[in-house]
Amino acid sequence: MSLVRRSNVFDPFSLDLWDPFDSVFRSVVPATSDNDTAAFANARIDWKETPESHVFKADLPGVKKEEVKVEVEEGNVLVISGQRSKEKEDKNDKWHRVERSSGQFMRRFRLPENAKVDQVKAGLENGVLTVTVPKAEVKKPEVKAIEISG
Protein backbone atom coordinates (compact mmCIF):
# COMPACT_ATOMS: atom_id res chain seq x y z
CA MET A 1 0.00 0.00 0.00
CA SER A 2 1.46 3.34 -1.08
CA LEU A 3 1.11 6.54 0.92
CA VAL A 4 1.49 8.63 -2.21
CA ARG A 5 -0.65 8.35 -5.32
CA ARG A 6 -0.86 10.22 -8.57
CA SER A 7 -4.10 11.75 -9.78
CA ASN A 8 -2.71 11.54 -13.29
CA VAL A 9 0.27 9.27 -14.01
CA PHE A 10 1.39 11.55 -16.86
CA ASP A 11 1.38 14.72 -14.74
CA PRO A 12 4.46 15.09 -12.47
CA PHE A 13 2.65 17.73 -10.35
CA SER A 14 -0.28 15.50 -9.42
CA LEU A 15 1.18 13.83 -6.32
CA ASP A 16 -1.33 13.55 -3.50
CA LEU A 17 -1.04 12.02 -0.05
CA TRP A 18 -3.00 8.81 0.20
CA ASP A 19 -6.19 9.07 2.23
CA PRO A 20 -7.57 5.71 3.39
CA PHE A 21 -11.03 7.22 3.91
CA ASP A 22 -11.19 8.96 0.54
CA SER A 23 -13.07 6.19 -1.29
CA VAL A 24 -15.40 5.63 1.68
CA PHE A 25 -16.16 9.35 1.93
CA ARG A 26 -16.83 9.67 -1.82
CA SER A 27 -19.28 6.75 -1.71
CA VAL A 28 -21.27 8.35 1.15
CA VAL A 29 -21.11 12.02 0.10
CA PRO A 30 -21.77 12.66 -3.58
CA ALA A 31 -19.33 14.93 -5.39
CA THR A 32 -20.53 18.45 -6.07
CA SER A 33 -19.36 21.07 -8.48
CA ASP A 34 -18.48 23.30 -5.52
CA ASN A 35 -15.67 21.14 -4.10
CA ASP A 36 -13.22 24.00 -4.64
CA THR A 37 -15.37 26.34 -2.55
CA ALA A 38 -15.94 24.03 0.41
CA ALA A 39 -12.87 25.10 2.40
CA PHE A 40 -13.53 28.81 1.98
CA ALA A 41 -17.27 28.58 2.53
CA ASN A 42 -16.59 27.53 6.11
CA ALA A 43 -14.17 30.35 6.95
CA ARG A 44 -12.46 29.66 10.27
CA ILE A 45 -12.79 32.48 12.78
CA ASP A 46 -11.19 32.83 16.21
CA TRP A 47 -13.13 34.62 18.97
CA LYS A 48 -11.35 35.71 22.13
CA GLU A 49 -12.56 37.81 25.02
CA THR A 50 -10.29 40.30 26.75
CA PRO A 51 -11.20 42.43 29.77
CA GLU A 52 -12.04 45.32 27.39
CA SER A 53 -13.52 43.66 24.29
CA HIS A 54 -14.45 40.66 22.15
CA VAL A 55 -11.96 40.15 19.29
CA PHE A 56 -12.73 38.11 16.16
CA LYS A 57 -9.95 37.15 13.72
CA ALA A 58 -10.40 35.50 10.33
CA ASP A 59 -7.72 34.50 7.83
CA LEU A 60 -8.91 35.80 4.46
CA PRO A 61 -5.86 35.70 2.16
CA GLY A 62 -6.42 37.26 -1.23
CA VAL A 63 -9.70 38.93 -0.22
CA LYS A 64 -10.02 42.70 -0.68
CA LYS A 65 -11.80 44.80 1.94
CA GLU A 66 -14.46 45.62 -0.67
CA GLU A 67 -15.31 41.90 -0.79
CA VAL A 68 -15.98 41.61 2.98
CA LYS A 69 -19.01 42.81 4.97
CA VAL A 70 -19.17 43.14 8.76
CA GLU A 71 -22.65 43.85 10.12
CA VAL A 72 -24.64 43.70 13.34
CA GLU A 73 -28.20 42.50 12.85
CA GLU A 74 -31.08 41.81 15.22
CA GLY A 75 -29.36 44.06 17.76
CA ASN A 76 -26.69 41.60 18.89
CA VAL A 77 -25.75 39.22 16.05
CA LEU A 78 -22.36 39.88 14.44
CA VAL A 79 -22.34 38.79 10.77
CA ILE A 80 -19.07 38.41 8.86
CA SER A 81 -19.55 37.61 5.18
CA GLY A 82 -17.83 37.98 1.86
CA GLN A 83 -16.65 36.40 -1.32
CA ARG A 84 -13.39 35.48 -2.97
CA SER A 85 -13.73 35.45 -6.74
CA LYS A 86 -12.20 32.77 -8.92
CA GLU A 87 -9.12 33.73 -10.87
CA LYS A 88 -9.81 34.58 -14.50
CA GLU A 89 -9.09 31.62 -16.73
CA ASP A 90 -7.62 31.82 -20.18
CA LYS A 91 -8.67 29.05 -22.56
CA ASN A 92 -4.97 28.42 -23.28
CA ASP A 93 -4.14 27.85 -19.59
CA LYS A 94 -3.40 24.33 -18.40
CA TRP A 95 -3.94 23.91 -14.67
CA HIS A 96 -1.82 21.30 -12.87
CA ARG A 97 -3.36 21.83 -9.43
CA VAL A 98 -6.14 23.97 -7.97
CA GLU A 99 -6.00 24.10 -4.16
CA ARG A 100 -6.88 27.69 -3.31
CA SER A 101 -10.56 27.97 -2.60
CA SER A 102 -13.04 30.57 -3.77
CA GLY A 103 -16.68 31.32 -3.18
CA GLN A 104 -18.91 32.93 -0.60
CA PHE A 105 -18.77 32.65 3.17
CA MET A 106 -20.92 33.83 6.06
CA ARG A 107 -20.52 33.38 9.80
CA ARG A 108 -22.86 34.61 12.56
CA PHE A 109 -22.06 35.11 16.24
CA ARG A 110 -24.57 36.01 18.96
CA LEU A 111 -22.88 38.67 21.06
CA PRO A 112 -23.30 38.84 24.84
CA GLU A 113 -25.40 41.56 26.45
CA ASN A 114 -22.35 43.60 27.47
CA ALA A 115 -21.24 44.14 23.83
CA LYS A 116 -21.21 47.77 22.65
CA VAL A 117 -22.56 47.04 19.16
CA ASP A 118 -22.57 50.74 18.24
CA GLN A 119 -18.75 50.88 18.60
CA VAL A 120 -17.67 47.85 16.51
CA LYS A 121 -14.44 48.36 14.54
CA ALA A 122 -13.03 46.19 11.74
CA GLY A 123 -9.74 46.16 9.85
CA LEU A 124 -8.17 43.97 7.16
CA GLU A 125 -4.38 43.80 7.19
CA ASN A 126 -2.09 41.24 5.54
CA GLY A 127 -5.05 38.94 4.81
CA VAL A 128 -6.30 38.88 8.42
CA LEU A 129 -9.67 40.44 9.26
CA THR A 130 -9.85 41.71 12.85
CA VAL A 131 -13.22 42.75 14.30
CA THR A 132 -13.20 44.35 17.75
CA VAL A 133 -16.41 44.68 19.77
CA PRO A 134 -15.87 46.76 22.94
CA LYS A 135 -17.50 45.60 26.17
CA ALA A 136 -19.58 47.79 28.45
CA GLU A 137 -18.04 48.36 31.84
CA VAL A 138 -19.46 46.03 34.42
CA LYS A 139 -21.09 48.16 37.06
CA LYS A 140 -20.53 46.82 40.49
CA PRO A 141 -23.76 46.75 42.45
CA GLU A 142 -23.98 49.70 44.75
CA VAL A 143 -23.78 48.67 48.37
CA LYS A 144 -25.61 50.85 50.82
CA ALA A 145 -24.85 50.37 54.48
CA ILE A 146 -27.93 50.25 56.69
CA GLU A 147 -27.59 51.61 60.18
CA ILE A 148 -28.77 49.24 62.86
CA SER A 149 -30.71 50.88 65.65
CA GLY A 150 -30.86 49.71 69.20
Curated annotation (Swiss-Prot):
Chief location: cytoplasm
Region Important for thermostability under elevated temperature, residue ranges: 1-42
Tagged with keyword Repeat: no
Chain ranges of the sHSP domain: 36-150
PROSITE patterns tied to this protein: SHSP
An example Gene Ontology biological process: response to hydrogen peroxide
Localization: Cytoplasm
Gene3D superfamilies from the UniProt entry: 2.60.40.790
Record-linked InterPro entries: A-crystallin/Hsp20_dom, HSP20-like_chaperone, Small_HSP
Gene Ontology CC terms, in alphabetical order: cytoplasm
Lineage top rank: taxon: Eukaryota
UniProt family annotation: Belongs to the small heat shock protein (HSP20) family.
Subunit structure: Forms oligomeric structures.
Protein name: 16.9 kDa class I heat shock protein 1
Species assigned in the record: Oryza sativa subsp. japonica (Rice)
Gene: HSP16.9A
